[in-house]
């Protein structure tokens, strides 16, 4: 039996949304689920205890960054990533591929792997399917990702076609190199840019390899959202119904709802934590930029409909002061709020699927979120 399995509970009668449970060696979580990103073995400014309090069930670690610092050997010596960072829930690690393709301009792709420069000190590095598997086996995550090529968007058809074929060959090498299939599940990543036939080919080729789960990669990289939704809708039909489906890099409220409707189960994104650091907050009325002068004496919470620690205890005026003064506590408060907001949104999505009313929920949510006149429909 694979290390990770998917249990289907029901499909929403209004949409293609799925309610399910993903079972892992470190516990189970209901889907659709958002996964906070802990790039360097920490979700920035948050303790594992705080993550549990806001109902985070699974978090993401970054293979590329952890390989470079502190090094996978140190994490292995500590007993794996769970012990190293004191998180006993499920962890997903990416393959390092996205960082190699996005952070480094000086890269050379060969059949063997990718040669590139360290994003800070310029030293030469090499990452291959085998190396990515070795690092992720050392990290000991519950879900590992296959090492894939991430073509830019847009890219020429012929280039993307060659790229997905290489991604499939690399996926086979990942399966061969994976040392711990009994306690770590390896997911394949479907690529194909904005070309429907290539997405289909990539999905079918990878499904033949029988991974325990599948991701859609190469979206949410700056393309218009309708293009992303179209690609998800098209690709979903070629993904197994009995395995988890992970849409990589998606974390805006509208996209989480739209892509849950289109049958996706798992999502991750740095968006809620990244925007929190400059004082941008997600609220039920839309985005709120706390640095704005009008909040200087506003004693209301960030969101009057929110029961997170931040909203129960602190005012907009206080949080604005902290962010303006560059106090770390301000970033902690906005991060707690944004992550709580998205995890609560996922809970609401799951409840709407249970009640067969996800399209109704979408309409209600969008209408309220768009009430922010200053920032209409900006998710």
From Swiss-Prot:
Binds 1 zinc ion per subunit. Substrate binds at residues 94-98, 148, 191, 218. Its EC number is 2.4.2.29. NCBIfam families: Q_tRNA_tgt (TIGR00430), tgt_general (TIGR00449). Coiled coil: none annotated. This is Queuine tRNA-ribosyltransferase. The active site is at 94 (proton acceptor), 268 (nucleophile). Belongs to the queuine tRNA-ribosyltransferase family. Keywords: Glycosyltransferase, Metal-binding, Queuosine biosynthesis, Transferase, tRNA processing, Zinc. Catalyzes the base-exchange of a guanine (G) residue with the queuine precursor 7-aminomethyl-7-deazaguanine (PreQ1) at position 34 (anticodon wobble position) in tRNAs with GU(N) anticodons (tRNA-Asp, -Asn, -His and -Tyr). Catalysis occurs through a double-displacement mechanism. The nucleophile active site attacks the C1' of nucleotide 34 to detach the guanine base from the RNA, forming a covalent enzyme-RNA intermediate. The proton acceptor active site deprotonates the incoming PreQ1, allowing a nucleophilic attack on the C1' of the ribose to form the product. Its cofactor is Zn(2+). Pathway: tRNA modification; tRNA-queuosine biosynthesis. One of its GO terms (molecular function) is metal ion binding. Zn(2+) binds at residues 306, 308, 311, 337. One of its GO terms (biological process) is queuosine biosynthetic process. The gene is tgt. Residues 249-255, 273-277 are annotated as: RNA binding. Homodimer. Within each dimer, one monomer is responsible for RNA recognition and catalysis, while the other monomer binds to the replacement base PreQ1. SUPFAM superfamilies: tRNA-guanine transglycosylase (SSF51713).
């Amino acid at each position: 039996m694979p290390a990770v399995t998917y249990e289907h509970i029901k499909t929403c009668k209004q949409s293609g949304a799925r309610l399910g449970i993903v079972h892992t060696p470190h516990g189970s979580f209901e889907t659709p689920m958002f996964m906070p990103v802990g790039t360097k073995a920490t979700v920035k400014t948050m303790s594992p205890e705080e993550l549990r309090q806001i109902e985070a069930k699974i978090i993401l670690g970054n293979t590329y960054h952890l390989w470079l610092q502190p090094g996978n050997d140190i994490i292995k010596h500590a007993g794996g990533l769970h012990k190293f960072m004191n998180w006993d829930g499920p962890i997903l690690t990416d393959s390092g591929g996205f960082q190699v393709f996005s952070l480094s301009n000086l890269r050379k792709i060969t059949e063997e792997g990718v040669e590139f420069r360290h994003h800070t000190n310029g030293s030469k590095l090499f990452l291959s399917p085998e190396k990515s598997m070795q690092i992720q086996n050392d990290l000991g995550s519950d879900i590992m990702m296959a090492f894939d090529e991430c073509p830019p968007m847009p890219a020429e058809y012929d280039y993307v076609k060659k790229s997905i074929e290489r991604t499939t060959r690399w996926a086979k090498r990942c399966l061969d190199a994976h040392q711990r299939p009994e306690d770590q599940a390896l997911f394949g990543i479907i690529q194909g840019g904005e070309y429907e036939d290539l997405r289909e080919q990539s999905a079918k080729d990878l499904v033949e390899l029988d991974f325990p789960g599948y991701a859609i990669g190469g979206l949410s990289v700056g393309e218009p959202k309708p293009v992303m939704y179209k690609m998800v809708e098209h690709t979903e039909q070629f993904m197994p119904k009995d395995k988890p489906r992970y849409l990589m890099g998606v974390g805006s409220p509208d996209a989480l709802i739209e892509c849950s409707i289109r049958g996706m189960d798992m999502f991750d994104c740095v968006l809620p934590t990244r925007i929190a650091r400059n004082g941008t907050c997600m609220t039920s009325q839309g985005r709120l930029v706390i640095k704005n002068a009008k909040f200087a004496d506003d004693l209301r919470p960030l969101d009057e409909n929110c029961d997170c620690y931040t909203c129960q205890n602190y005012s907009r005026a206080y949080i604005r002061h902290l962010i303006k003064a560059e106090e770390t506590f301000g970033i902690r408060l906005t991060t707690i709020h944004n992550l709580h907001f998205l995890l609560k949104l996922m809970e609401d999505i799951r409840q709407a699927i249970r009640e067969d009313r996800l399209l109704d929920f979408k309409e209600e949510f969008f209408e309220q979120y768009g009430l922010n006149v200053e920032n209409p429909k900006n998710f």
